[in-house]
Regions:
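Hydrophobic alpha-helical membrane-insertion segments, chiefly the h-region
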Residues: 19-28
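N-terminal Sec-pathway targeting helices
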Residues: 1-18
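Active-site beta->alpha N-cap acidic-glycine motif
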Residues: 33-126, 131-147, 236
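Catalytic domains of cell-wall/extracellular-matrix polysaccharide-remodeling enzymes
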Residues: 114-216, 220-238, 242-243, 249, ...
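C-terminal domain-boundary segment and adjacent tail
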Residues: 40-48, 76-78, 89-91, 222-273
Length: 273
Protein backbone atom coordinates (compact mmCIF):
# COMPACT_ATOMS: atom_id res chain seq x y z
CA UNK A 1 0.00 0.00 0.00
CA UNK A 2 2.79 2.39 0.98
CA UNK A 3 4.64 1.49 -2.21
CA UNK A 4 1.57 2.26 -4.34
CA UNK A 5 1.02 5.65 -2.63
CA UNK A 6 4.69 6.52 -2.98
CA UNK A 7 4.65 5.51 -6.63
CA UNK A 8 1.58 7.69 -7.27
CA UNK A 9 3.27 10.62 -5.49
CA UNK A 10 6.33 10.29 -7.69
CA UNK A 11 4.15 10.23 -10.81
CA UNK A 12 2.21 13.31 -9.67
CA UNK A 13 5.43 15.20 -8.85
CA UNK A 14 6.81 14.21 -12.24
CA UNK A 15 3.70 15.46 -14.02
CA UNK A 16 3.83 18.75 -12.12
CA UNK A 17 7.48 19.18 -13.09
CA UNK A 18 6.69 18.52 -16.75
CA UNK A 19 3.80 21.01 -16.73
CA UNK A 20 5.88 23.71 -15.02
CA UNK A 21 8.85 23.14 -17.33
CA UNK A 22 6.68 23.14 -20.46
CA UNK A 23 4.85 26.29 -19.39
CA UNK A 24 8.10 28.07 -18.54
CA UNK A 25 9.60 27.06 -21.86
CA UNK A 26 6.53 28.33 -23.72
CA UNK A 27 6.64 31.66 -21.90
CA UNK A 28 10.38 32.02 -22.52
CA UNK A 29 9.98 31.13 -26.20
CA UNK A 30 7.15 33.62 -26.60
CA UNK A 31 9.12 36.37 -24.86
CA UNK A 32 12.16 35.64 -27.01
CA UNK A 33 10.11 36.60 -30.04
CA UNK A 34 9.48 40.08 -28.68
CA UNK A 35 11.94 42.87 -29.65
CA UNK A 36 12.24 43.96 -26.01
CA UNK A 37 13.54 40.53 -25.00
CA UNK A 38 16.82 41.11 -26.82
CA UNK A 39 17.25 44.79 -25.88
CA UNK A 40 20.34 45.01 -23.69
CA UNK A 41 19.64 48.58 -22.54
CA UNK A 42 17.15 47.55 -19.84
CA UNK A 43 19.52 44.96 -18.43
CA UNK A 44 22.51 47.30 -18.37
CA UNK A 45 20.47 49.88 -16.47
CA UNK A 46 19.25 47.23 -14.05
CA UNK A 47 22.72 45.91 -13.32
CA UNK A 48 24.16 49.37 -12.65
CA UNK A 49 21.12 50.84 -10.93
CA UNK A 50 22.19 53.53 -8.45
CA UNK A 51 25.71 53.81 -9.89
CA UNK A 52 27.20 56.52 -12.08
CA UNK A 53 28.40 54.53 -15.06
CA UNK A 54 29.22 55.58 -18.63
CA UNK A 55 29.68 53.41 -21.71
CA UNK A 56 31.42 55.00 -24.69
CA UNK A 57 30.28 53.59 -28.03
CA UNK A 58 31.43 54.44 -31.55
CA UNK A 59 29.52 53.68 -34.76
CA UNK A 60 30.27 53.43 -38.49
CA UNK A 61 34.02 52.74 -38.35
CA UNK A 62 36.73 51.73 -38.48
CA UNK A 63 38.41 54.53 -40.41
CA UNK A 64 42.06 55.35 -41.02
CA UNK A 65 41.73 58.98 -39.93
CA UNK A 66 39.45 59.16 -36.91
CA UNK A 67 39.67 55.74 -35.25
CA UNK A 68 43.40 55.92 -34.40
CA UNK A 69 42.90 59.37 -32.84
CA UNK A 70 39.94 58.09 -30.81
CA UNK A 71 42.02 55.11 -29.68
CA UNK A 72 44.82 57.43 -28.60
CA UNK A 73 42.44 59.38 -26.34
CA UNK A 74 40.98 56.18 -24.89
CA UNK A 75 44.44 54.78 -24.19
CA UNK A 76 45.50 57.99 -22.47
CA UNK A 77 42.54 57.76 -20.09
CA UNK A 78 42.74 53.96 -19.80
CA UNK A 79 39.13 53.50 -20.98
CA UNK A 80 37.74 50.54 -22.89
CA UNK A 81 34.93 51.31 -25.33
CA UNK A 82 32.61 49.51 -27.74
CA UNK A 83 33.00 49.89 -31.50
CA UNK A 84 29.98 48.99 -33.63
CA UNK A 85 31.69 48.38 -36.94
CA UNK A 86 30.44 48.27 -40.52
CA UNK A 87 31.54 45.25 -42.53
CA UNK A 88 32.38 47.45 -45.52
CA UNK A 89 34.66 49.63 -43.36
CA UNK A 90 36.28 46.53 -41.86
CA UNK A 91 37.09 45.24 -45.35
CA UNK A 92 38.66 48.61 -46.19
CA UNK A 93 40.60 48.96 -42.91
CA UNK A 94 41.31 45.51 -41.44
CA UNK A 95 44.49 46.73 -39.76
CA UNK A 96 42.56 49.41 -37.87
CA UNK A 97 40.06 46.84 -36.60
CA UNK A 98 42.97 44.72 -35.36
CA UNK A 99 44.28 47.76 -33.46
CA UNK A 100 40.85 48.25 -31.85
CA UNK A 101 40.78 44.63 -30.76
CA UNK A 102 44.38 44.61 -29.53
CA UNK A 103 43.56 47.69 -27.43
CA UNK A 104 41.07 45.64 -25.41
CA UNK A 105 37.94 47.21 -26.87
CA UNK A 106 34.69 45.39 -27.52
CA UNK A 107 33.57 44.88 -31.12
CA UNK A 108 29.88 45.01 -32.01
CA UNK A 109 28.10 44.48 -35.31
CA UNK A 110 26.55 47.46 -37.15
CA UNK A 111 25.65 45.68 -40.37
CA UNK A 112 27.63 45.71 -43.58
CA UNK A 113 26.49 48.69 -45.64
CA UNK A 114 24.47 51.08 -43.42
CA UNK A 115 21.93 51.16 -46.25
CA UNK A 116 18.61 50.94 -44.43
CA UNK A 117 16.58 50.06 -47.52
CA UNK A 118 18.78 47.01 -48.03
CA UNK A 119 19.43 46.02 -44.41
CA UNK A 120 15.79 46.14 -43.35
CA UNK A 121 14.27 44.87 -46.61
CA UNK A 122 13.50 41.43 -45.16
CA UNK A 123 14.60 39.09 -42.39
CA UNK A 124 16.89 37.01 -44.61
CA UNK A 125 18.67 40.11 -45.96
CA UNK A 126 19.10 41.39 -42.39
CA UNK A 127 20.66 38.14 -41.18
CA UNK A 128 22.85 37.96 -44.27
CA UNK A 129 24.31 41.44 -43.60
CA UNK A 130 25.11 40.60 -39.99
CA UNK A 131 26.73 37.32 -40.91
CA UNK A 132 28.67 38.95 -43.75
CA UNK A 133 30.01 41.54 -41.30
CA UNK A 134 30.99 38.79 -38.87
CA UNK A 135 32.95 37.09 -41.62
CA UNK A 136 34.74 40.37 -42.41
CA UNK A 137 35.65 40.72 -38.73
CA UNK A 138 36.95 37.13 -38.60
CA UNK A 139 39.11 37.74 -41.64
CA UNK A 140 40.50 41.01 -40.28
CA UNK A 141 41.29 39.57 -36.84
CA UNK A 142 42.35 36.19 -38.20
CA UNK A 143 40.12 34.51 -35.61
CA UNK A 144 38.05 31.93 -37.53
CA UNK A 145 35.55 31.28 -34.72
CA UNK A 146 34.99 34.90 -33.65
CA UNK A 147 31.29 35.56 -33.08
CA UNK A 148 29.71 38.94 -32.41
CA UNK A 149 26.79 38.87 -30.01
CA UNK A 150 25.83 42.55 -29.84
CA UNK A 151 24.23 44.58 -32.63
CA UNK A 152 23.34 48.22 -33.04
CA UNK A 153 20.67 49.17 -35.56
CA UNK A 154 21.85 51.83 -38.04
CA UNK A 155 19.75 54.93 -37.24
CA UNK A 156 18.76 53.24 -33.96
CA UNK A 157 16.01 50.77 -33.17
CA UNK A 158 13.68 53.34 -31.62
CA UNK A 159 13.80 55.82 -34.52
CA UNK A 160 10.67 55.89 -36.73
CA UNK A 161 12.68 55.03 -39.85
CA UNK A 162 11.68 51.54 -41.08
CA UNK A 163 10.07 50.89 -37.69
CA UNK A 164 7.89 47.93 -38.65
CA UNK A 165 10.75 46.29 -40.55
CA UNK A 166 13.10 46.76 -37.60
CA UNK A 167 10.59 45.05 -35.32
CA UNK A 168 10.70 42.00 -37.56
CA UNK A 169 14.50 42.10 -37.63
CA UNK A 170 14.76 42.45 -33.85
CA UNK A 171 12.64 39.34 -33.37
CA UNK A 172 15.12 37.44 -35.55
CA UNK A 173 18.19 38.42 -33.50
CA UNK A 174 17.99 35.65 -30.85
CA UNK A 175 17.97 33.00 -33.59
CA UNK A 176 21.49 34.08 -34.59
CA UNK A 177 22.75 34.64 -31.03
CA UNK A 178 22.40 38.42 -30.85
CA UNK A 179 21.09 41.16 -28.62
CA UNK A 180 20.96 44.85 -29.55
CA UNK A 181 21.49 48.15 -27.78
CA UNK A 182 20.69 51.76 -28.65
CA UNK A 183 21.93 54.83 -26.75
CA UNK A 184 20.55 57.43 -24.36
CA UNK A 185 22.97 60.33 -24.85
CA UNK A 186 24.61 61.88 -27.91
CA UNK A 187 27.13 64.49 -29.03
CA UNK A 188 25.77 64.74 -32.60
CA UNK A 189 29.39 64.57 -33.71
CA UNK A 190 28.28 63.29 -37.12
CA UNK A 191 26.31 66.45 -37.92
CA UNK A 192 28.25 68.53 -40.43
CA UNK A 193 29.66 71.90 -39.35
CA UNK A 194 28.65 71.50 -35.71
CA UNK A 195 31.20 73.26 -33.49
CA UNK A 196 33.07 71.45 -30.75
CA UNK A 197 31.32 73.60 -28.15
CA UNK A 198 27.88 72.94 -29.61
CA UNK A 199 28.51 69.21 -29.75
CA UNK A 200 29.65 69.16 -26.12
CA UNK A 201 26.61 71.19 -25.03
CA UNK A 202 24.34 68.69 -26.77
CA UNK A 203 26.00 65.92 -24.80
CA UNK A 204 25.52 67.73 -21.50
CA UNK A 205 21.86 68.29 -22.31
CA UNK A 206 21.13 64.70 -23.38
CA UNK A 207 23.03 63.16 -20.45
CA UNK A 208 21.52 65.38 -17.75
CA UNK A 209 19.88 63.53 -14.88
CA UNK A 210 20.96 60.06 -16.04
CA UNK A 211 23.09 57.77 -13.91
CA UNK A 212 23.73 55.12 -16.57
CA UNK A 213 24.89 56.56 -19.89
CA UNK A 214 25.20 54.79 -23.23
CA UNK A 215 26.95 57.47 -25.27
CA UNK A 216 26.76 57.51 -29.07
CA UNK A 217 29.71 58.86 -31.04
CA UNK A 218 31.20 58.08 -34.45
CA UNK A 219 34.66 57.21 -35.76
CA UNK A 220 33.84 57.20 -39.46
CA UNK A 221 34.58 60.73 -40.65
CA UNK A 222 36.52 63.82 -39.62
CA UNK A 223 33.68 66.35 -39.79
CA UNK A 224 33.66 67.59 -36.21
CA UNK A 225 36.82 66.39 -34.45
CA UNK A 226 35.10 63.58 -32.57
CA UNK A 227 38.28 62.93 -30.61
CA UNK A 228 38.25 66.51 -29.21
CA UNK A 229 34.62 66.24 -28.09
CA UNK A 230 35.47 62.80 -26.69
CA UNK A 231 38.13 64.30 -24.44
CA UNK A 232 35.73 67.03 -23.28
CA UNK A 233 33.12 64.36 -22.53
CA UNK A 234 35.52 62.15 -20.58
CA UNK A 235 36.81 65.01 -18.43
CA UNK A 236 33.28 66.24 -17.74
CA UNK A 237 32.08 62.81 -16.63
CA UNK A 238 35.14 62.14 -14.49
CA UNK A 239 34.50 65.42 -12.68
CA UNK A 240 30.89 64.30 -12.14
CA UNK A 241 32.07 61.05 -10.56
CA UNK A 242 31.24 58.64 -13.38
CA UNK A 243 33.08 55.38 -13.87
CA UNK A 244 33.72 54.18 -17.42
CA UNK A 245 32.91 50.58 -18.25
CA UNK A 246 32.86 48.39 -21.34
CA UNK A 247 29.82 46.55 -22.64
CA UNK A 248 32.07 43.51 -22.82
CA UNK A 249 32.07 43.57 -19.03
CA UNK A 250 28.32 43.14 -19.13
CA UNK A 251 28.66 40.57 -21.88
CA UNK A 252 30.97 38.49 -19.69
CA UNK A 253 28.48 37.95 -16.88
CA UNK A 254 25.23 37.99 -18.85
CA UNK A 255 25.99 36.14 -22.05
CA UNK A 256 28.26 33.33 -20.92
CA UNK A 257 25.37 30.88 -20.55
CA UNK A 258 23.77 32.09 -23.78
CA UNK A 259 27.00 31.45 -25.64
CA UNK A 260 27.08 27.88 -24.38
CA UNK A 261 23.44 27.33 -25.36
CA UNK A 262 23.95 28.94 -28.75
CA UNK A 263 27.10 26.93 -29.38
CA UNK A 264 25.30 23.67 -28.58
CA UNK A 265 22.37 24.69 -30.75
CA UNK A 266 24.68 25.38 -33.69
CA UNK A 267 26.66 22.21 -33.12
CA UNK A 268 29.87 24.18 -33.24
CA UNK A 269 32.26 26.25 -31.22
CA UNK A 270 31.37 29.74 -30.05
CA UNK A 271 34.33 31.99 -29.42
CA UNK A 272 34.74 34.61 -26.73
CA UNK A 273 37.87 36.07 -25.32
Amino acid sequence: MFFVIKQKSIIIIGLIFIIVFTTSFFIFSFAANEPESCDLMHEVKEKYRGEKVAFLTFDDGPSKIVTPKVLEVLERYDIEATFFVLGKAVDENPDVLKTIYDGGHFIGNHGYSHKANKLYSCESAFKEELQKTEESIRQALQIPDFNCTLFRFPNGFTSPIYKSQKNICAKALPSIGYKYIDWNSVTNDSVQKLSRESSFNIFKKTSKGKDVLIILMHDSGDLNKTYDVLEDTINYLLEKGYEFKSLEEFFDWHFSYLLVLYSCKQGGKTWKR
